[in-house]
UniProtKB/Swiss-Prot annotation:
Organism field: Snake adenovirus serotype 1 (SnAdV-1)
Name of the protein this chain belongs to: Protein E4.2
Domain of life: Viruses
Amino acid sequence: MELSRIPEGLVCSSGRPYHAKACFKATLHGFCPPFVLQQALKELLTPVLYDQFYCETPLSQKKAHVHRCRNRCVTFYWHCHCSSANSLQCAAAKKVANSVFYHSFIVMQNDNKMCPVPVCCDTWACIPFKPLGIVKQRRCTCYFFVMGGKFETEVLHVASEYSVKFLPFKPNVEIVCVICSCVDSPESCLKRVRRMMNCLRMVMCCSFVNADALQR
């Protein structure tokens, strides 16, 4: 889907001049911020092509859609910033991008598949770590979580068998992306990640943190 201009009322994340805009729609669930899919799309495009032709944060979206807290379809507007608008190189890059977008079934699945086990007080103040959803790609599955506080060390230790990325979201809050490249069945993969998540929740709960502080 080509756009001649960006619709009014959108929040553009880049103030740079742009051209050759293309749309990509993704389904997001609950409180999951739209930008969590950015890294997945960048890997599909390859960083070389992505960094040369597209925004670092290629999201333009109506504020009302960004801040909705229930299932919604979010539209990404990819702005090409190359120096030769409508050149063969630009057209080729756009064609590759569109092919990647439309043949990649990137859907943020509902977070209720994660089934966190109640631990301690089971509140955000007690356990600042909650699942957001799952994105399945061709070669891996990405599990997204929202995390408060400074628990990067704990996450890296408990999730050492996975590739983990931290995406800043707001002050003292991060989006954690746990990437699994196993060849097991989706059910087995989800079961292991769920076990890892519940272990992390136990390590982060107020009872464990306070007991650890007293021992020190």
